[in-house]
Structures are given as structure tokens and as C-alpha cells.
Swiss-Prot record:
Keyword match Oxidoreductase: yes
Cofactor(s) required for function per UniProt: pyridoxal 5'-phosphate
Keyword terms: Oxidoreductase, Pyridoxal phosphate
Function text: The glycine cleavage system catalyzes the degradation of glycine. The P protein binds the alpha-amino group of glycine through its pyridoxal phosphate cofactor; CO(2) is released and the remaining methylamine moiety is then transferred to the lipoamide cofactor of the H protein.
NCBIfam families named in the record: gcvP (TIGR00461), PRK04366.1 (NF003346)
Domain of life: Bacteria
Protein known as: Glycine dehydrogenase (decarboxylating)
Length: 958
């Protein structure tokens, strides 16, 4: 035996599991690229002046079993008290059939945002269900497919109200004082950058004010009172003031829809529909509005359209509103939202149906009525006369009540002066109610629950008659057909089969980093130690979370070369916003609040200018040279021109053109010379980890897409996490929180509802870093770079590689130019993308950052076998284009312009110039394993001209 025990223990096993190719395959690819080793590859590609001598130290790797055991020990430090805190968060029950077949299913959680609708019909249908749930319960005309959280949705409502307001000189936004404090916090943060004045007061006080463009009301107040705002909203309409209403989705099952009372915008959280609290997230927010405001809505909207054969098909509608097209003029910077969580909420509604949901809501309300009656019998006073699930109980002995609750391992709401709050939920039982009566009142409960039940059932007025829902909801068959577990399981499986996710094939989307989301990384997100924690529980109960987040923050700080991390932002775009706010606040602290110019290269991702606009900055575009690099001369000229007002530059590294720009250090130096800060977008961090760091390069702040580089799955369009790393001078200016005190940052406004954003998915990134260790992380980056260069090398004779670095290499992604093919043969990047579906692949990123191109990012997780299959598909497509050029196939009837091809086409009359086999089995690989798209190419023009964003009749599904 020549192996040592250390070798046999194989602590770096996970590296081999995560990196797709074997050492032998890596060597073969290196040979094709003409390089002897991974280290030589990075030495040749990465500029010398930014290369690290050794990778950042995050420790050695660990096996899956070791990492899971270590994290489990940390998780057990969380104290699992029963939380009745409320404030927009409540325990819920995730039906096991949805847990197993959706949340834990890579066919659902590894998919990408459905930009390619032909391979996304399953989750698009589920998101349409989510929109239907939202439309029905809010009483509005149109709904989006989720936003990041309720507080963000409220801030978006304010921004939207200003966009659609006819009161152009009004700059005041009114918020009713019975709003969740975290919602108000995020609204104030957004208002500050827009220059809006936020006024908080009793709702009726708005009628005494001038210059108000919008109002935010909360139907069920944060302290529990149900508000009938119909008269107020009617009066506001006469004054042309836009009214937004924050609503509780579970309460809406019983309460009158705000839309029926005249609301213009309705928003809230769908967390109560089967999604765990998770210490604050991730949760899907819902957002709905009147039809007249549809063009001003933020976020993705799923619409019903048709495909090339005239059949019903779904797509993302009205994308011209969004940041990837409108940039700084976009309605919002929203990119990643909360699709996976929206799908869970939608399936929760599908599984329970309207009657099941009504039963749950009525049970919650009945138990709240019983609790109220029991407390009154025991001598307690309630602050309000109306409620759905939340009571505010007056007490002269608050300390005593809270001590009894603590002894019983119960959390009540503590921040109400002279009172405690208690919010019941789906998991509350009659036994829980008895305990609460005794704990809050300090007296034994001498009555009988059934007696109280009979009393309140016959006499309750806690929901006013005028506020009771009377209309039928969820009448579509989708909410009535799948109430048995068998039918539900099959429904989710049918939808899954329509989609292409990482469990089927590689997803080579440039700038998206669709890498492995390992099963071991995913396991902890369903542990009750993580899922059951309320975000506003006392800190001593969340020691496990705090330890895990602190360790992850320290690792990320080392990996990025920054001094501090802020883990609050819920997405990359929100991280951009938070980082730019830190820069803005830093300048203001130095008496330089006039610095508002943000320089952004023309190649930047659309979120950059959209985020800069949201942060109150003015975007000035910097040109790129013919090689795709930032034009240093143009940058310097504009930095000098705007030096008195220069706030920052936003750059991506490697660039969005897939190149390590040689002048990145010079870019940083120029900006600093003129008093600005450097924001380095972390979208391409997968080509930096272990090789260089943003801090070492010279930047001041970056966000990280944990759902790219650090293995949180994309979920079909969310969840994501976008924490920011900052240099020490910016650390005091990162987001704080109004509810939970955070070390060192208590004065700055929040950007997310919860202090750590979507905290319950952070264990995924913790597991990834812990298992890979320093060397594994560096190797992952190197192999990602190798894979991209291998693809470029093999394709270069058939496709033009648009950009490369000084040595002729690309970074972790490459761009192939389809424009010459379009000019010469009439075949577009769209045709190539759709034809790849017939070969079993999701298309690369289309027309970004350059129109008429495809950007390919293979990541380190794909094997050489899969990469070769993808390359062979592109080479075969190039040969098919030659067939068009040679006249074998007409330019208007060939397998590219007609792609993709569906199974149903095969049994129809075939009049094409090419065979059925050529259409659907274009390679040997497809004969062994075939993905069938559910629809043909979408008719985008029809979809936008005939906007329909709710469920169609069931006959259309069959």
C-alpha cells in the first residue's frame, strides 16, 4: 500500500464531485488549448499585476459528511421557540408533496429565468397560477410573477405611484402609521434617494395634506386591526392620489379584496402559503395593479401568447419595461426575483384549492377569536375590536408576561408600548391557545375551548360584515383538480417535464454561472433549526444563524479582499443598490453630497444603470474600444470633466465581454484620483475566486451573486442573494435595520425586509466554501476558465470569437458572433438558439452584451463529455447553415428557422424540405436522450399586442 491514511481519508473528495471533468479530461482540454497546466493557464490569461501569490485562506476542504455534521452542530445552537411575533412572518406548513417534488427537485430549482419560453412552459404555467392567485385575492387586473419581499414591493409601489401620477409636482408620499416597521424602513430608504418626503400618520390625516402623490395603507395593521379604507380610497381618487395597499395573503382569503375598494396597487408577502419563515427569507412578494398602469409595473409578468403553430404558449410579457432593455430608464432594477418561492405558494394554492384555503384561514381566525374571548374572560384588555389573526393585548405587567412566555419557550411581540402582540398561524392548535391565555393573563384557563368556540362562532364581529369576502375566487380548474397527493405529484411532474434544467443538460448562459447546486449543499435549507426561526426573535435564540453568517461573511471577505460584508441584499441587483447607497452616504458624510455622476461602460449589464438611477445617481456612459475593453481615454476624459460631481464607476471584472482587461488597475486609479469610488460588479466573480480579488484589484465595494458563484440555485428566476463587500471606509454606510439592532450599522436605512435578507439559503454557500476549501475554490475558477477557452478553441474555425485578451484567450465565458451568418445566410442568433433546443440544450445568452451574438459560459461543473456534446451541436448547426448556403434547404424552410420542433409535429403532415429525423434527432446524442419542447417558437409580437396574464380555460392545457 503506497497511500497514506490522510490520502485515504480523501477530504478533498467534494472537489472532484463538483468539478465535472476528471484530471485526465482536464489534461486533454489543456492540450487543445495549448497549455501545460491550470496554473500556466491563469498566469497567461490574468494580468500579472492583479494575480495573487496564494489563494485567500478559507481553510482546507471537507467531505460532505464532515461539513454537514459541522453545520448541523451550528444549527442546533438555534433555540426553536414557538413564535407568535407576527409582523408579516408566520409559521406555515409546506405540504410534503410540494417539499419532495418541487423544493427538493433539481428539475425545479436548477432552472434559469424563463427567457427561453420554449424550454420553460412548466414553471411559466405555475407562475401564471401564482399570478391568478394574486389577481383573485387582491381583486386587481394584473399581477407580477413575484418581487423580492413585502418591504421591497412597498418601495416599488411608491416608485410606481410616482411614475403614473398625474400630480407631477407632488413629491410627498404618505404612509399610514399602522404599517410593519421593516416596510416603512425600506420605503424611507428608497424615498431618500428619489428626494421624496415620507409622512407617517393616522391614515385619515392624509386628507389634510397637499403635495401628496401616493399613499401606502395596510389592510390588516401591524398591530392587528382590520381597516376598511373604502371611503378614504374613494376620497383619494377624487384628488388623483395613487393608493397602494399592503395586504396579508391569508387574511385576503376571508377579507374583501382591496381592488374592490378602489386600490390602485396591492402588495404583500406570499410566505404564509407554505413557505417557512427561514429567519427572514426567501419569500415571494406579490404585486398587483390596475390594467391602466401595466406598463409601469416592476418585475416579471407572465403572459399568454401563442407559438408559431398557433397553439397557446406562455412567455414573459412586456419585457421592454425591464432593466436588461431599458437600463437606467427601466421601471425597476429587479432581475432575480423569487420564482421558486412563488411556485411553492402557487402549488400550495393548487393543492388546497379555494375551500381548503378558506378552511385554513377560518381556523386561524376562529382560534384568534377564542384567544380573544379567553383573554377577556381572564381580565385582559384588547387594543382593537377587529382582527384576523393578531391581537394587541394591553398589560401593566409586560415584564411578567414576557418572562412567563420565555419560560414556556414562546416569543410574543415586544415592541408595542404598554402591550404585547400575538399572531396565530396555520400551525396553531387549541392547546396552544389555552397556553397563550394562561401565559398572557397569568391566570389559569377555567373554561372549555368548545364552549368558547360555540360562543364566538355565533357572535363574533371581529371581521366587520362589510369586510367579509363575498366573491368567488380561484374558479379555474387548476385549483380544483389536484387535491389528492397522486394527482398533485403528477401535475408537478408534468410541468417539470416541459422544462429544461441542469438535471437534463448544461445551461451555457453567459454571465449567469449555471453551475452545480450539490445535494449536500441543499440539504440544510430544509432543516427545522433553520426554517422555523422568526427574523425578529431575540438574538440569543439565533446563535446558530449568527455563527454561520459570521463564518460565511469572514470567508467571503477573504475571498473578495474586502474588510467587511453586509449580508442583507436579497439579489444581485439589490446588492448593487445597497453598494451604491453606501457610496452615496460616504460622500454625504464628507460634505460631498453633490457627487452624483456614475460612470458605466456601454457593455454593462442593464441592472448597473438601473441601480444607479435608483440610488439617485446620474449615469454617464463610457465607451469601449474595438477589443471590447473600457476606453481608458474616454474614461479619463469623463472622470476629469465630472471630477467635482464624480461619485463612482461601475465595472464588471472580467468584463461582460468575457475578457480580463489589462487596464483594470488603471481604471481604479483614475477614479480615485478624481475623488470617486470604484464599484466592481461581482457578476463574473467565478473567474476571480482564488486567483485575484476585487479588493486587491483596487475597488471599494462589490456585490456577490451567491446564486452564481457560490452555488445557490437560480430556482427558475430566484431566490438569490447579493451580499456586498466593502473597504473599511464604506463599512459604516451599509444597510442597517430598524427592528433588529446590528453591530456597527444601526443608523442606515434597510434595503430588505429582514436584517439578513434570505438567510435560510445562506447555508448553501457555507457548505460550498467549507467543502471546497481554498485550493478547491481556486481550481474551480481555473477549470471554468479552461472550459471556456476549450470551447473557444474548438469553435474558432467555424464561428468568430468576438473578443479575447492580449494573449488571445478568453476568461470564463466567450462570445460567438452570429452577425456574419445573418448577413450572409439569413440565419440569426435567435435561429441558432432555438435550434440548440432540438439538440437538447438551453441557448447561451442571446444578444448580450452585443446584439447578434451568443455568450457561452460553461462553468467548472460541466464535464468534458457534456461540453463536447454542446460543441458538436454548434458545429452541426454550422454545417446546417452551410446547407442553406448551398441551396439544399430554402432560406425560409430549414431546420433552423423552424426550430424548435415538437413531438406533435411528427404526426402531422410533413411538407418541409428536410426530414423528420433531421428535425428532432439531429445528433446521435439526441437519439439516446431526447428533450422535447412543449411548444414551437413563441410569437412575441402577438403576446405583447394581446396581453393576457391569468389562467386560460383548462381545455387549452389538454
Amino acid at each position: 500500500m503506497t497511500q497514506t491514511l490522510t490520502q485515504l481519508e480523501y477530504r478533498d473528495e467534494f472537489i472532484r464531485r463538483h468539478i465535472g471533468s476528471s484530471p485526465e479530461q482536464i489534461k486533454e482540454m489543456l492540450d487543445v488549448v495549448g497549455i501545460s497546466s491550470l496554473n500556466e493557464l491563469t498566469q497567461k490569461i490574468v494580468p500579472d499585476n492583479i494575480q495573487l501569490a496564494t489563494p485567500p485562506n478559507v481553510g482546507g476542504g471537507a467531505t460532505e459528511q464532515e461539513a454537514l455534521a459541522e453545520l448541523k452542530a451550528i444549527a442546533r445552537k438555534n433555540k426553536r421557540f414557538t413564535s407568535y411575533i407576527g409582523m408579516g412572518y408566520a409559521p406555515s406548513v409546506l405540504p410534503p408533496v410540494i417539499l419532495r417534488n418541487l423544493l427538493e427537485n433539481p428539475g425545479w430549482y436548477t432552472a434559469y429565468t424563463p427567457y427561453q419560453p420554449e424550454v420553460s412552459q412548466g414553471r411559466l404555467e405555475s407562475l401564471l397560477n401564482f399570478q391568478q392567485v394574486t389577481i383573485d385575492y387582491t381583486g386587481m387586473d394584473l399581477a407580477s410573477a413575484s418581487l423580492l419581499d413585502e418591504a421591497t414591493a412597498a418601495a416599488e409601489a411608491m416608485a410606481m405611484a410616482k411614475r403614473v401620477s398625474k400630480l407631477k409636482n407632488a413629491e410627498r408620499f404618505f404612509v399610514a402609521d399602522d404599517i410593519h416597521p421593516q416596510t416603512l424602513d425600506v420605503v424611507k430608504t428608497r424615498a431618500n434617494t428619489f428626494g421624496f418626503e415620507v409622512i407617517v400618520d393616522k391614515a385619515e390625516k392624509v386628507l389634510e395634506l397637499e403635495g401628496v402623490f401616493g399613499v401606502l395603507l395596510q389592510q390588516v395593521g401591524t398591530t392587528g386591526e382590520i381597516h376598511d379604507y373604502s371611503q378614504l380610497i374613494s376620497e383619494l381618487k377624487t384628488r388623483k392620489i395613487i393608493t397602494s395597499v399592503a395586504a396579508d395573503l391569508m387574511a385576503l382569503v376571508l377579507l374583501t379584496a382591496p381592488g374592490q375598494q378602489g386600490a390602485d396597487i396591492v402588495l404583500g408577502s406570499a410566505q404564509r402559503f407554505g413557505v417557512p419563515m427561514g429567519y427572514g427569507g426567501p419569500h415571494a412578494a406579490f404585486f398587483a395593479c390596475r390594467d391602466e398602469y401595466k406598463r409601469a409595473m416592476p418585475g416579471r409578468i407572465i403572459g399568454v401568447s401563442r407559438d408559431a403553430a398557433g397553439n397557446r404558449a406562455l412567455r414573459m410579457a412586456m419585457q421592454t419595461r425591464e432593466q436588461h432593455i431599458r437600463r437606467e430608464k427601466a421601471n425597476s432594477n429587479i432581475c432575480t426575483s423569487q420564482v421558486l418561492l412563488a411556485n411553492i405558494a402557487a402549488m400550495y394554492a393548487v393543492y388546497h384549492g379555494p375551500e381548503g384555503l378558506k378552511n385554513i384561514a377560518q381556523r386561524i381566525h376562529r382560534l384568534t377569536d377564542i384567544l380573544a374571548a379567553g383573554l377577556i374572560q381572564n381580565g385582559m384588555t384588547l387594543r382593537h375590536q377587529t382582527w384576523f389573526d393578531t391581537l394587541t393585548v394591553e398589560t401593566a405587567d409586560k415584564a411578567g408576561v414576557l418572562q412567563r412566555a420565555k419560560d414556556a419557550e414562546i416569543n410574543l411581540r415586544t415592541d408595542i408600548v404598554g402591550a404585547v402582540g400575538v399572531t396565530l398561524s396555520e400551525v396553531t392548535t387549541r392547546e396552544d391557545v389555552v397556553r397563550l391565555i394562561e401565559i398572557i393573563s397569568g391566570k389559569a384557563f377555567s373554561d372549555d375551548i368548545d364552549t368558547l368556540d360555540a360562543l364566538v362562532a355565533s357572535s363574533s364581529t371581529s371581521i366587520p360584515t362589510a369586510m367579509l369576502r363575498k366573491d368567488a375566487v380561484l374558479t379555474h380548474e387548476n385549483f380544483h383538480l389536484y387535491h389528492s397527493e397522486t394527482e398533485m405529484m403528477r401535475y408537478m411532474h408534468r410541468l417539470e417535464n416541459k422544462d429544461l434544467a441542469l438535471n437534463q443538460a448544461m445551461i451555457p448562459l453567459g454571465s449567469c454561472t449555471m453551475k452545480l447546486n450539490a445535494a449536500a449543499e441543499m440539504l440544510p435549507i430544509t432543516w427545522p433549526e433553520f426554517t422555523e426561526m422568526h427574523p425578529f426573535c431575540p438574538p440569543y435564540q439565533a446563535q446558530g444563524y449568527q455563527i454561520m453568517i459570521e463564518q460565511l461573511s469572514n470567508w467571503l471577505a477573504a475571498i473578495t479582499g474586502y474588510d467587511a460584508m453586509c449580508m442583507q441584499p436579497n439579489s444581485g441587483a439589490q446588492g448593487e443598490y445597497a453598494g451604491l447607497l453606501a457610496i452615496r452616504r460616504y460622500h454625504q458624510s464628507r460634505g460631498e453630497g453633490n457627487r452624483h455622476i456614475c460612470l458605466i461602460p456601454s457593455s454593462a449589464h442593464g441592472t448597473n444603470p438601473a441601480s444607479a438611477h435608483m440610488a439617485g445617481m446620474t449615469v454617464v456612459v463610457v465607451g469601449c474600444d474595438e477589443n471590447g475593453n473600457i476606453d481608458i481615454a474616454d474614461l479619463k476624459a469623463k472622470a476629469e470633466k465630472h471630477q467635482a460631481e464624480l461619485s463612482c464607476v461601475m465595472v464588471t471584472y472580467p468584463s461582460t465581454h468575457g475578457v480580463y482587461e489589462e487596464g483594470i488597475r488603471e481604471v481604479c486609479e483614475i477614479i480615485h484620483q478624481y475623488g470617486g469610488q470604484v464599484y466592481l460588479d461581482g457578476a463574473n466573480m467565478n473567474a476571480q475566486v482564488g486567483i485575484t480579488t476585487p479588493g486587491f484589484i483596487g475597488s471599494d465595494v462589490s456585490h456577490l451573486n451567491l446564486h452564481k458563484t457560490f452555488c445557490i440555485p437560480h430556482g427558475g428566476g430566484g431566490p438569490g442573494m447579493g451580499p456586498i463587500g466593502v473597504k473599511a471606509h464604506l463599512a459604516p454606510f451599509v444597510p442597517g435595520h430598524s427592528v433588529v439592532e446590528m453591530d456597527g450599522v444601526t443608523t442606515q436605512g434597510a434595503v430588505s425586509a429582514a436584517q439578513f435578507g434570505s438567510a435560510s439559503i445562506l447555508p448553501i454557500s457555507w457548505m460550498y466554501i467549507r467543502m471546497m476549501g481554498s485550493e478547491g475554490l481556486k481550481q474551480a475558477s481555473q477549470v471554468a476558465i479552461l472550459n471556456a477557452n476549450y470551447i473557444a478553441q474548438r469553435l474558432k474555425d467555424d464561428y468568430d470569437i468576438l473578443y479575447s485578451g492580449a494573449e488571445g484567450y478568453v476568461a470564463h465565458e466567450c462570445i460567438i458572433d452570429i452577425r456574419p451568418l445573418k448577413a450572409n445566410y439569413g440565419i440569426s442568433e435567435m435561429d441558432v438558439a432555438k435550434r440548440l433546443i432540438d439538440y437538447g440544450f438551453h441557448a447561451p445568452t442571446m444578444s448580450f452584451p452585443v446584439a447578434g451574438t451568443l455568450m457561452i459560459e460553461p462553468t467548472e461543473s460541466e464535464s468534458k463529455v457534456e461540453i463536447d456534446r454542446f460543441i458538436d451541436a454548434l458545429l452541426s448547426i454550422r454545417a446546417e447553415i452551410a446547407q442553406v448556403d448551398d441551396g439544399v434547404w430554402p432560406i425560409d424552410d430549414n431546420p433552423l428557422v423552424n426550430a424548435p420542433h415538437t413531438q406533435y409535429e411528427l404526426v402531422q403532415e410533413w411538407s418541409h424540405s428536410y426530414s423528420r429525423e433531421c428535425a428532432v434527432f439531429p445528433s446521435e446524442a439526441t437519439k439516446r436522450n431526447k428533450y422535447w419542447p412543449a411548444v414551437k417558437r413563441l410569437d412575441d409580437v402577438y403576446g405583447d399586442r394581446h396581453l393576457h396574464c391569468s389562467c386560460a380555460p383548462i381545455s387549452d392545457y389538454e
